[in-house]
Amino acid sequence: MSKEKFERTKPHVNVGTIGHVDHGKTTLTAAITKIMSEARGGEFKDYADIDNAPEERERGITISTAHVEYESEARHYAHVDCPGHADYIKNMITGAAQMDGAIIVIAATDGPMAQTREHILLSKQVGVPYIVVYMNKADMVDDEELVELVELEIRELLDEYDFPGDDTPIIFGSALKALEGDMSDIGMSSIIKLVKALDTYIPTPKRDTDKSFLMPIEDVFSISGRGTVVTGRIEAGIVYVGDELEIVGIKDTQTTTCTGVEMFRKLLDSGEAGDNVGVLLRGTKREEVERGQVLAKPGSIKPHSKFEAEVYILSKDEGGRHTPFFNNYRPQFYFRTTDVTGACQLPDGVEMVMPGDNVKMQVELLSPIAMEDGLRFAIREGGRTVGAGVVSKVTD
């Protein structure tokens, strides 16, 4: 059988497994790839391949993550699984694997545990929009009432963190049985049901080109006789020659017009998400624009300096700080293309933050940055990364 060409016709969705240690995340990931590859072609990854996940670096932090892919009738899925609990936290905070939805794996034998709770809270904080539940190890429970209790507990826990507990699909099965080829309800068919739940419950994400135009400014030049050119990689949306744009962040917001788009020394009518371009601006002086600002569709993004964040602080072994920090710690916050100094307020009852900890904090920047909930940043001291974070809520 010849290999099928990877088709771009199906919408692409990013998912991942989360949940307490030893509840079966990696076994489930292996089972999905096995059953979907048998049904639709694709590559089966066994448990060992996934568990020996390669280390990656994201914003200066080393994270072990396994990436697998599979297809359903309707979609192409990219799925991440992390071997260690710390890897999950780093992964979710750095956005190394941005998820359109998460599969939370909960052992029916234990019910929700400490890390289950922590992962649901983090999903909320970092903006994972949808959760589907796989209640695993069904072959080890024969008490129907116990299963109902666990299900109730899961729905209440989801409600507690503002996920719709009553509407969340909960699939009951055994990832191990499915992997072994068991044909019963809790075996292979539970995996088919799970993938169907992903197809129907997680909406197709908006493509980057459908979002409002946004380009972080990396560099500014002036070209005599033509005006000012700003360069950068377009993060979202499309810009057309003739568009009115805003320059947002650091200083007061200014309005300008795009009079040209250039890529690889060629003039274009437009630039879109993913392109590295130079944008020629009319009526904007070279000294009015700087790296760290963004070029955006008017009204689509505002500058802010106060926010609540979920942060991971690197351990000493990861090249982070060797000592804890205290309230009013003032590092640099690196947003998109630039560093801005900010002051940190720790939560009540938290005296200090140790290297290797994750913490929720309030931050006030010295100058405003174009920002919205979900924006990622690095925390740096003198150019060295000491932490990573995500804006969970803009507060000004």
UniProtKB/Swiss-Prot annotation:
It is an enzyme of class 3 (hydrolase). The keyword Cytoplasm applies. Pfam families: GTP_EFTU, GTP_EFTU_D2, GTP_EFTU_D3. Residues 19-26 are annotated as: G1. Its EC number is 3.6.5.3. Its main location: cytoplasm. It catalyses: GTP + H2O = GDP + phosphate + H(+). Residues 60-64 are annotated as: G2. GO terms for molecular function: GTP binding; GTPase activity; guanosine tetraphosphate binding; translation elongation factor activity. Residues 174-176 are annotated as: G5. The keyword Thylakoid does not apply. Mg(2+) binds at residue 26. It comes from the Bacteria. InterPro entries: EF-Tu_GTP-bd (IPR041709), EF-Tu_GTPase (IPR050055), EFTu-like_2 (IPR004161), EFTU_2 (IPR033720), G_TR_CS (IPR031157), P-loop_NTPase (IPR027417), Small_GTP-bd (IPR005225), T_Tr_GTP-bd_dom (IPR000795). Residues 136-139 are annotated as: G4. CDD domains: EF_Tu (cd01884), EFTU_II (cd03697), EFTU_III (cd03707). Residues 10-206 form the tr-type G domain. Residues 81-84 are annotated as: G3. Gene3D superfamilies: P-loop containing nucleotide triphosphate hydrolases, Translation factors. Belongs to the TRAFAC class translation factor GTPase superfamily. Classic translation factor GTPase family. EF-Tu/EF-1A subfamily. Monomer. NCBIfam families: EF-Tu (TIGR00485), PRK00049.1 (NF000766), PRK12735.1 (NF009372), PRK12736.1 (NF009373), small_GTP (TIGR00231). GTP hydrolase that promotes the GTP-dependent binding of aminoacyl-tRNA to the A-site of ribosomes during protein biosynthesis. This is Elongation factor Tu 1. It comes from Ruthia magnifica subsp. Calyptogena magnifica. The gene is tuf1.
